[in-house]
Amino acid sequence: MRPLVIIIMGSPGSGKGTQAELLAEKFNLYHFETSEIIERNLAAAEKGDFIKIGGKKYFLSEEKKLREKGKWMNPPLIAFWVNNKIKALSKEKKGIVFSGSPKTLYEAKKVIPLLKKLYGISNIKIILIEQKQEVSIWRNSHRRICELMRHSILYTKETAKLKKCPFDGSKLVFREDSDPKVIKSKLKEFKERTLPLIDYFKKERLKVKKVNGEQSVAAVFQNIFKALND
Protein backbone atom coordinates (compact mmCIF):
# COMPACT_ATOMS: atom_id res chain seq x y z
CA MET A 1 0.00 0.00 0.00
CA ARG A 2 1.37 3.41 -1.00
CA PRO A 3 1.72 6.24 1.57
CA LEU A 4 -0.84 9.04 1.94
CA VAL A 5 -0.51 12.56 0.49
CA ILE A 6 -2.55 15.42 1.95
CA ILE A 7 -2.55 18.90 0.37
CA ILE A 8 -3.73 21.71 2.68
CA MET A 9 -4.86 24.85 0.83
CA GLY A 10 -5.90 28.15 2.37
CA SER A 11 -5.26 31.88 2.37
CA PRO A 12 -2.40 33.30 4.47
CA GLY A 13 -3.04 32.82 8.19
CA SER A 14 -5.64 30.08 7.74
CA GLY A 15 -3.62 27.69 9.88
CA LYS A 16 -2.27 25.44 7.13
CA GLY A 17 1.01 24.89 8.93
CA THR A 18 -0.59 24.16 12.29
CA GLN A 19 -3.02 21.64 10.82
CA ALA A 20 -0.26 20.05 8.76
CA GLU A 21 1.80 19.52 11.92
CA LEU A 22 -1.15 17.81 13.61
CA LEU A 23 -1.83 15.62 10.56
CA ALA A 24 1.85 14.73 10.26
CA GLU A 25 1.81 13.47 13.83
CA LYS A 26 -1.53 11.67 13.44
CA PHE A 27 -0.65 9.82 10.23
CA ASN A 28 3.17 9.74 10.54
CA LEU A 29 3.64 12.01 7.51
CA TYR A 30 6.44 14.36 6.51
CA HIS A 31 5.27 17.96 6.92
CA PHE A 32 6.25 19.53 3.62
CA GLU A 33 6.30 23.20 4.59
CA THR A 34 7.14 24.95 1.33
CA SER A 35 7.84 28.31 3.00
CA GLU A 36 10.48 26.68 5.20
CA ILE A 37 12.18 25.08 2.19
CA ILE A 38 12.15 28.43 0.38
CA GLU A 39 13.52 30.34 3.37
CA ARG A 40 16.31 27.83 3.97
CA ASN A 41 17.40 27.89 0.32
CA LEU A 42 17.36 31.70 0.22
CA ALA A 43 19.17 32.01 3.55
CA ALA A 44 21.98 29.75 2.31
CA ALA A 45 22.36 31.65 -0.98
CA GLU A 46 25.34 33.91 -1.56
CA LYS A 47 25.52 37.00 -3.77
CA GLY A 48 25.29 36.05 -7.44
CA ASP A 49 23.91 32.55 -6.80
CA PHE A 50 21.38 31.32 -9.35
CA ILE A 51 19.59 28.15 -10.44
CA LYS A 52 19.21 27.39 -14.14
CA ILE A 53 15.88 25.84 -15.15
CA GLY A 54 14.80 25.30 -18.75
CA GLY A 55 17.64 27.47 -20.00
CA LYS A 56 16.71 30.43 -17.77
CA LYS A 57 18.69 31.67 -14.78
CA TYR A 58 16.84 32.49 -11.56
CA PHE A 59 18.97 34.70 -9.31
CA LEU A 60 18.20 33.96 -5.67
CA SER A 61 18.87 37.54 -4.55
CA GLU A 62 16.08 38.74 -6.87
CA GLU A 63 13.75 35.99 -5.65
CA LYS A 64 14.40 37.06 -2.07
CA LYS A 65 13.42 40.65 -2.90
CA LEU A 66 10.13 39.45 -4.39
CA ARG A 67 9.34 37.47 -1.25
CA GLU A 68 10.15 40.39 1.06
CA LYS A 69 7.67 42.58 -0.86
CA GLY A 70 4.90 40.01 -0.46
CA LYS A 71 5.16 38.99 -4.12
CA TRP A 72 5.38 35.37 -5.17
CA MET A 73 8.62 33.95 -6.41
CA ASN A 74 8.92 32.48 -9.90
CA PRO A 75 6.92 29.19 -10.08
CA PRO A 76 9.61 27.22 -12.00
CA LEU A 77 12.05 27.70 -9.11
CA ILE A 78 9.48 26.68 -6.50
CA ALA A 79 8.46 23.61 -8.53
CA PHE A 80 12.13 22.67 -8.92
CA TRP A 81 12.74 22.64 -5.15
CA VAL A 82 9.40 20.96 -4.40
CA ASN A 83 9.75 18.14 -6.93
CA ASN A 84 13.30 17.33 -5.85
CA LYS A 85 12.08 16.90 -2.28
CA ILE A 86 9.04 14.84 -3.34
CA LYS A 87 11.27 12.38 -5.21
CA ALA A 88 13.53 12.00 -2.18
CA LEU A 89 10.57 11.36 0.15
CA SER A 90 9.05 8.84 -2.25
CA LYS A 91 12.28 6.84 -2.27
CA GLU A 92 12.03 6.71 1.53
CA LYS A 93 8.39 5.53 1.17
CA LYS A 94 7.32 8.49 3.28
CA GLY A 95 3.83 10.01 3.17
CA ILE A 96 3.49 13.80 2.84
CA VAL A 97 1.27 16.60 4.09
CA PHE A 98 1.72 19.88 2.18
CA SER A 99 1.08 23.34 3.63
CA GLY A 100 1.77 25.86 0.89
CA SER A 101 2.18 23.84 -2.30
CA PRO A 102 1.12 23.96 -4.98
CA LYS A 103 0.30 27.68 -5.11
CA THR A 104 0.12 28.32 -8.86
CA LEU A 105 -1.25 26.51 -11.89
CA TYR A 106 2.29 26.14 -13.23
CA GLU A 107 3.44 24.50 -10.02
CA ALA A 108 0.37 22.26 -9.84
CA LYS A 109 0.94 21.01 -13.39
CA LYS A 110 4.48 20.04 -12.39
CA VAL A 111 3.72 18.61 -8.94
CA ILE A 112 0.38 16.78 -9.33
CA PRO A 113 1.45 14.44 -12.18
CA LEU A 114 4.54 13.50 -10.15
CA LEU A 115 2.44 12.81 -7.05
CA LYS A 116 0.01 10.69 -9.09
CA LYS A 117 2.88 8.68 -10.51
CA LEU A 118 4.68 8.13 -7.21
CA TYR A 119 1.75 7.85 -4.77
CA GLY A 120 -1.38 7.06 -6.82
CA ILE A 121 -4.49 9.22 -7.31
CA SER A 122 -6.53 7.42 -4.63
CA ASN A 123 -3.95 8.37 -1.99
CA ILE A 124 -4.04 12.12 -2.72
CA LYS A 125 -6.41 14.13 -0.49
CA ILE A 126 -7.00 17.90 -0.80
CA ILE A 127 -8.39 20.16 1.93
CA LEU A 128 -9.30 23.86 1.48
CA ILE A 129 -9.39 25.84 4.75
CA GLU A 130 -11.69 28.83 4.26
CA GLN A 131 -11.69 32.15 6.15
CA LYS A 132 -12.78 35.76 5.53
CA GLN A 133 -10.22 38.34 4.36
CA GLU A 134 -10.44 40.39 7.57
CA VAL A 135 -9.73 37.28 9.62
CA SER A 136 -6.70 36.51 7.47
CA ILE A 137 -5.28 40.03 7.87
CA TRP A 138 -5.74 39.99 11.65
CA ARG A 139 -4.25 36.52 12.07
CA ASN A 140 -1.27 37.27 9.84
CA SER A 141 -0.38 40.49 11.65
CA HIS A 142 -0.20 38.48 14.89
CA ARG A 143 1.34 35.27 13.53
CA ARG A 144 4.71 34.11 14.83
CA ILE A 145 7.34 31.53 13.95
CA CYS A 146 9.93 29.78 16.10
CA GLU A 147 13.61 30.67 15.80
CA LEU A 148 14.90 27.10 15.53
CA MET A 149 12.77 25.32 12.91
CA ARG A 150 10.53 28.22 11.76
CA HIS A 151 7.32 26.42 12.72
CA SER A 152 4.42 28.77 11.94
CA ILE A 153 2.18 29.35 14.98
CA LEU A 154 -1.37 30.50 14.22
CA TYR A 155 -2.61 33.23 16.58
CA THR A 156 -5.65 31.98 18.52
CA LYS A 157 -6.96 32.10 22.09
CA GLU A 158 -5.02 28.91 22.74
CA THR A 159 -1.69 30.29 21.47
CA ALA A 160 -1.92 34.00 22.39
CA LYS A 161 0.19 33.70 25.55
CA LEU A 162 2.74 31.25 24.19
CA LYS A 163 6.36 32.43 24.32
CA LYS A 164 7.97 29.18 23.20
CA CYS A 165 7.27 26.90 20.24
CA PRO A 166 5.01 23.96 21.24
CA PHE A 167 6.88 21.73 18.78
CA ASP A 168 10.56 22.34 19.63
CA GLY A 169 10.63 24.74 22.60
CA SER A 170 12.51 27.56 20.84
CA LYS A 171 11.61 31.27 21.14
CA LEU A 172 8.65 32.61 19.15
CA VAL A 173 9.22 35.72 17.00
CA PHE A 174 7.08 37.68 14.52
CA ARG A 175 7.44 36.81 10.85
CA GLU A 176 9.19 39.25 8.52
CA ASP A 177 6.09 39.43 6.30
CA SER A 178 3.57 40.37 9.04
CA ASP A 179 3.06 43.92 7.69
CA PRO A 180 -0.62 44.52 6.65
CA LYS A 181 0.41 45.81 3.19
CA VAL A 182 2.41 42.63 2.56
CA ILE A 183 -0.51 40.51 3.80
CA LYS A 184 -2.99 42.22 1.45
CA SER A 185 -0.62 41.63 -1.45
CA LYS A 186 -0.43 37.94 -0.55
CA LEU A 187 -4.23 37.68 -0.30
CA LYS A 188 -4.56 39.20 -3.77
CA GLU A 189 -2.06 36.66 -5.12
CA PHE A 190 -3.96 33.83 -3.41
CA LYS A 191 -7.29 34.80 -4.99
CA GLU A 192 -5.82 35.32 -8.45
CA ARG A 193 -3.33 32.45 -8.62
CA THR A 194 -4.22 29.75 -6.08
CA LEU A 195 -8.03 29.52 -5.96
CA PRO A 196 -8.18 28.73 -9.72
CA LEU A 197 -6.35 25.48 -8.90
CA ILE A 198 -9.62 24.02 -7.63
CA ASP A 199 -10.88 23.71 -11.21
CA TYR A 200 -7.59 22.10 -12.24
CA PHE A 201 -7.84 19.55 -9.44
CA LYS A 202 -11.36 18.63 -10.54
CA LYS A 203 -10.13 18.07 -14.10
CA GLU A 204 -7.45 15.80 -12.64
CA ARG A 205 -10.22 13.83 -10.84
CA LEU A 206 -9.08 15.03 -7.42
CA LYS A 207 -11.73 15.98 -4.85
CA VAL A 208 -11.37 19.18 -2.82
CA LYS A 209 -12.99 19.12 0.65
CA LYS A 210 -13.77 22.51 2.23
CA VAL A 211 -13.40 23.24 5.96
CA ASN A 212 -14.32 26.34 7.99
CA GLY A 213 -11.02 27.78 9.22
CA GLU A 214 -12.51 30.38 11.57
CA GLN A 215 -12.93 27.84 14.36
CA SER A 216 -10.53 26.73 17.07
CA VAL A 217 -7.49 24.70 16.04
CA ALA A 218 -9.05 21.56 17.56
CA ALA A 219 -12.38 22.05 15.75
CA VAL A 220 -10.69 22.61 12.39
CA PHE A 221 -8.60 19.47 12.90
CA GLN A 222 -11.70 17.41 13.73
CA ASN A 223 -13.42 18.65 10.56
CA ILE A 224 -10.37 17.87 8.44
CA PHE A 225 -10.13 14.38 9.94
CA LYS A 226 -13.81 13.82 9.13
CA ALA A 227 -13.37 15.12 5.56
CA LEU A 228 -10.45 12.77 4.97
CA ASN A 229 -12.60 9.81 5.95
CA ASP A 230 -15.77 10.77 4.03
Residue positions per predicted region:
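Glycine-rich phosphate-binding loop of ATP-dependent small-molecule kinases
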Residues: 1-230
